[in-house]
């Protein structure tokens, strides 16, 4: 009489179909990776919204101080850096690092039909240009059109896994960051003092 021969696939299938021990642990292990990525992605989106709101609030407060003439720069980098650390950084809040903030205040040249929108089209926001001349400021006199721009480099949780969510840091090579941008265009109020544009 010939021995009954079972194929290896049939034997493995029978073993796996009868033994269900560890199946739940295996299912959790399979679902853990997408759950962790989804959880970290949700946390990152929430953090990015928080940074955007904090940066927009800080830019609006700083723009108001320039608009009413409360901020007068002496034209030196020290005065501009002191203004950023005394006026813009406290408005960011304590959870954000002021060392990752880059601010620029420029006047929009009047005349030749130029306004806020044509100036932005001709001078798009550039983080690399702002990093090279960080915290530059120009305070013009009354009724001058001004533009305040700010970039904040925030850390990213999933930047290494999903490169589309982040970009290479222009300050620290090899580190991926999420760049948040806020700007405010305004016309200075009529105040005394201030440099002529």
Report each predicted region and the residues it spans:
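Alpha-helical assembly-interface signal, strongest on the long, hydrophobic N-terminal helix that forms
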Residues: 1-91
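Short, conserved structural patches
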Residues: 2-6, 61-197
């Amino acid at each position: 009489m010939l021995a009954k021969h079972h194929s290896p696939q049939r034997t493995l299938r029978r073993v796996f179909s009868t033994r269900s021990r560890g199946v739940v642990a295996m299912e959790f292990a399979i679902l853990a990776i997408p759950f962790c990525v989804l959880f970290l992605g949700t946390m990152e989106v929430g953090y990015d919204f928080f940074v955007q709101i904090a940066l927009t609030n800080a830019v609006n407060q700083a723009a108001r101080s320039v608009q009413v003439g409360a901020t007068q720069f002496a034209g030196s980098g020290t005065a501009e850096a002191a203004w950023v650390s005394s006026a813009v950084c406290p408005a960011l809040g304590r959870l954000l690092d002021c060392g990752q903030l880059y601010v620029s205040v420029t006047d929009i040249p009047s005349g030749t039909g130029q306004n806020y929108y044509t100036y932005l089209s001709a001078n798009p926001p550039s983080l690399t240009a702002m990093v090279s001349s960080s915290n530059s400021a120009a305070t013009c006199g009354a009724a001058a059109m001004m533009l305040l721009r700010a970039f904040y480099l925030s850390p990213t949780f999933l930047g290494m896994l999903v490169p589309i969510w982040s970009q290479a840091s222009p300050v620290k090579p090899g580190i991926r960051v999420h760049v948040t941008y806020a700007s405010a265009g305004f016309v200075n109020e009529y105040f005394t003092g201030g440099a002529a544009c």
